[in-house]
């Protein structure tokens, strides 16, 4: 099998720009995932985020997780469970309104650090969306405009730790799923593996590369590209050894009232395929309500369910201007 795509974004600024853009295009079309190096985010900042995130888990969350596992009987499993994940998490909201000042137990220095980190990830997310636009033949800013709706995109971070698990064959760190939203940027542990994606019917490891940012595409980009790019099923395996695995996933998603539909330009480019929309038109908030109930099920029935709701969305709605 071909190797997992690792993209050196620094090469976009030189003679290898065309080759690098082609690598991004291939990764989006054939993997739904790629890994970025030389992405412009300070390595010192990433080291500090990793250090303080692991310290926060040890200080504030480790004992709670152990108690929760014990209370649910997950420390003495005898058979496989498919309705729970072996992970400890908390969430930070950045857009349209930040909650980072309200999340309990965070040291002030950690709050400040994560605000800085979120700003850098937001900027990189928008830069990557424009690279996708370029490869798709869409005007610069098209995806960002679609994501804005009447307000701003929904942007937040899930901070996860996957502690050592005594029965990794019986419980996943995170069950297989596709991501509901737009573009997801992941800063993951470079010492402990575990993230896998499904490609051609086989589970493939996403290699932990120091200081890299893993990018994956969500369901909304599959719809907007009319299936040219696909969201891909992925999971996290539980581990028995070490200190556990850190994962910081930031989700740059459409605003709640954003109307999502295949880009007309991409339908036109599919002339040989009868110029038809293969995907529904819907309000992102409606999709999320459905997704929250069936996250760990196949995405195709979600798309079919949204098709049944299409009549509630005006047929002539286009991308709304940014604020």
UniProtKB/Swiss-Prot annotation:
A Gene Ontology cellular-component term: extracellular region
Upregulating conditions: Strongly induced by wounding, ethrel, iron, ethylene and 1-amino-cyclopropane-carboxylic acid (ACC). Accumulates in response to very-long-chain fatty acids (VLCFAs C20:0 to C30:0).
Pathway connected to this protein: Alkene biosynthesis; ethylene biosynthesis via S-adenosyl-L-methionine; ethylene from S-adenosyl-L-methionine: step 2/2
Binding site for Fe cation: 177, 179, 234
Keyword Transcription recorded: no
EC number: 1.14.17.4
Needed cofactors: Fe cation
N-acetylmethionine modified-residue sites: 1
InterPro entries, sorted: DIOX_N (IPR026992), IPNS-like_FE2OG_OXY (IPR044861), IPNS-like_sf (IPR027443), Oxoglu/Fe-dep_dioxygenase_dom (IPR005123), Plant_2OG-oxidoreductases (IPR050295)
UniProt keyword annotation of Acetylation present: yes
GO MF term list: 1-aminocyclopropane-1-carboxylate oxidase activity; L-ascorbic acid binding; metal ion binding
Binding positions (2-oxoglutarate): 245
Catalytically driven reaction(s): 1-aminocyclopropane-1-carboxylate + L-ascorbate + O2 = ethene + L-dehydroascorbate + hydrogen cyanide + CO2 + 2 H2O
Signal sequence region: none
Tissue: Expressed in vegetative tissues. Expressed constitutively at a low level in leaves and blades.
GO biological process: cellular response to fatty acid; defense response; ethylene biosynthetic process; fruit ripening; response to fungus
Annotated coiled-coil segments of the chain: none
Broadest EC class assigned to this enzyme: oxidoreductase
Source organism, top-level taxon: Eukaryota
Fe2OG dioxygenase domain segment(s): 153-254
Keywords: Acetylation, Ethylene biosynthesis, Fruit ripening, Iron, Metal-binding, Oxidoreductase, Plant defense, Vitamin C
Family: Belongs to the iron/ascorbate-dependent oxidoreductase family.
UniProt-listed PANTHER family: OXOGLUTARATE/IRON-DEPENDENT DIOXYGENASE
Job of this protein: Enzyme involved in the ethylene biosynthesis. May promote stem elongation by maximizing the extensibility cells, possibly by activating ethylene biosynthesis, in response to very-long-chain fatty acids (VLCFAs C20:0 to C30:0).
Name used for this protein in its record: 1-aminocyclopropane-1-carboxylate oxidase 4
Organism: Arabidopsis thaliana (Mouse-ear cress)
Upper taxonomic lineage: Eukaryota, Viridiplantae, Streptophyta, Embryophyta, Tracheophyta
């Amino acid at each position: 099998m071909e190797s997992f795509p690792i993209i050196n974004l620094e090469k976009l600024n030189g003679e290898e720009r065309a080759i690098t853009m082609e690598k991004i295009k291939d990764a989006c079309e054939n993997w739904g995932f790629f890994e970025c190096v030389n992405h412009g985010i300070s390595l010192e900042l990433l080291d500090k985020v990793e250090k303080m995130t692991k310290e926060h888990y040890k200080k504030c969350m480790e004992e709670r997780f152990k108690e929760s596992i014990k209370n649910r009987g997950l420390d003495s499993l005898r058979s496989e469970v498919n309705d729970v994940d072996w992970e400890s998490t908390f969430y930070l909201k950045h857009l349209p309104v930040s909650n980072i000042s309200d999340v309990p137990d965070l040291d002030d220095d950690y709050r400040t650090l994560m605000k800085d980190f979120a700003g850098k990830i937001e900027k990189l997310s928008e830069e990557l969306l424009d690279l996708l636009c370029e490869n798709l033949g869409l005007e610069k800013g098209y995806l960002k405009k679609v994501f804005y709706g009447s307000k701003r995109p929904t942007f937040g971070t899930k901070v996860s730790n996957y502690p050592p698990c005594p029965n990794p064959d019986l419980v996943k760190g995170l069950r297989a799923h596709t991501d509901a939203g737009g573009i997801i940027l992941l800063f993951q542990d470079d010492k402990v593996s575990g993230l896998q994606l499904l490609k051609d019917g086989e589970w493939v490891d996403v290699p932990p590369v120091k200081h890299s940012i893993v990018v994956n595409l969500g369901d909304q980009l599959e719809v907007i590209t009319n299936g040219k790019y696909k969201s891909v099923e992925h999971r996290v395996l539980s581990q028995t050894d070490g200190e556990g695995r850190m994962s910081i996933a930031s989700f740059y998603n459409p605003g709640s009232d954003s109307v999502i539909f295949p880009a007309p330009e991409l339908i036109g480019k599919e002339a040989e395929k009868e110029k038809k929309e293969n995907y529904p038109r819907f309000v992102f908030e409606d999709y999320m309500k459905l997704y929250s109930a069936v996250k760990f099920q196949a995405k195709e029935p979600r798309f079919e369910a949204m098709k049944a709701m299409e009549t509630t969305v005006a047929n002539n709605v286009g991308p709304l201007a940014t604020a």
